[in-house]
Amino acid sequence: GAVTKHISSAHPYCPELRKIAIQVGKDLGITTHEKGTVVVIQGPRFSTVAESRWFSKMGWDVINMTQYPEVYLARELGICYANIALITDYDAGLEGRDDIEPVTEEAVLKVFAENNEKVKNMLFEVIKRIDLENSNCTCCNVDLSGLDL
């Protein structure tokens, strides 16, 4: 039968890439949050008010559709991976805040368009700062023995 491996995803993102991305964001004057907890929903769709309320009560900071399964697949293959989340909206709105509307596709696309250059510049700078020669990264130390790759 097929051989499977269980790879730890306790720390799914590469610590070295995260440090670089955080520093680049700060250096470029981009509002940068050094940590947070993301909840991944299956898209493409937006959350209901009930889901949004639950996510907030659970302490999750960001609702996202695109970090999983990519992060786990990268971990399985021993590939360094970090995520740069562009915050576009307040999901289904904020309770008690009539001035904040629930998300729309148009609003998300507008924020993406407004930040496209910032994200491109950030990615190019992150790539420039990756130092493969002096890396202490252990992402590639995944035991893939026994797998027919």
Range-by-range predicted roles:
Residues 101-103:
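Membrane-interfacial helix-loop-helix connectors in multipass membrane proteins
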